[in-house]
């Protein structure tokens, strides 16, 4: 992807998603001032076509899944979302309408969860498509939840149903008879980041993980 096309794509699709500190996505980096009295929490996850999503998955769903798997990491730490950096590697020749749907999915969940894009990179690849996101959140000092806090004898509590996403993938691959637009498929495509629960568990749970 040449620089003129990259800049045009960013201006047309991603600039409307930009938040404070993103500098209109026109500079080399973003500027971020953490909220007073808060620690920053950072996590990163990537989605690769054929590994984490199927080639015919709706682009908006792929974008929302990308955001949500990262938000889930914040939830596990008891953090609140602040913003994110994202690298998109679209396959060469990806239709503009596909990218527009992808961005619309991001916009929908940005509004739902209260965060904005701060920067990133956009490239073209011969395939497979790959999308990487670094999420930034905040938590009061000393209140982050850790995996290492667990102790022998602790009770283990689970929110949601374990395995729904894996079953949903089998449905979409035709390996399990069920509605391809039903509950299991939706759980595979759209995980639910439990941000409110994670924040409520600060000072209550000794450990957490997503």
List where the protein language model places each region.
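Helix-biased detector of long, well-ordered alpha-helical tracts
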Residues: 1-209
């Amino acid at each position: 992807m040449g620089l003129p096309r990259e800049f045009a794509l960013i201006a047309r699709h991603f600039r409307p998603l930009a938040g404070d500190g993103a500098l209109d996505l026109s500079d080399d980096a973003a500027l971020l001032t953490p909220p007073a009295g808060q620690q920053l929490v950072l996590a990163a996850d990537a989605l690769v076509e054929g590994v984490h999503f199927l080639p015919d998955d709706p682009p908006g769903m792929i974008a929302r899944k990308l955001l949500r798997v990262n938000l889930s990491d914040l939830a596990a730490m008891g953090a609140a979302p602040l913003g994110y950096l994202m690298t998109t590697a679209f396959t060469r020749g990806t239709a503009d309408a596909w990218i527009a749907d992808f961005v619309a999915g991001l916009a929908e969940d940005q509004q739902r969860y209260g965060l904005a894009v701060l920067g990133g990179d956009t490239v073209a690849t011969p395939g497979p498509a790959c999308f990487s996101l670094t999420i930034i959140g905040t938590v009061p000092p000393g209140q982050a939840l850790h995996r290492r806090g667990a102790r022998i004898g602790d009770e283990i509590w689970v929110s949601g149903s374990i395995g729904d996403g894996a079953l949903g993938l089998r449905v979409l691959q035709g390996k399990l008879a069920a509605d391809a637009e039903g509950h299991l498929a939706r759980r595979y495509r759209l995980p639910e980041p439990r941000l409110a629960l994670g924040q409520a568990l600060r000072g209550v749970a000794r450990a957490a993980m997503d």
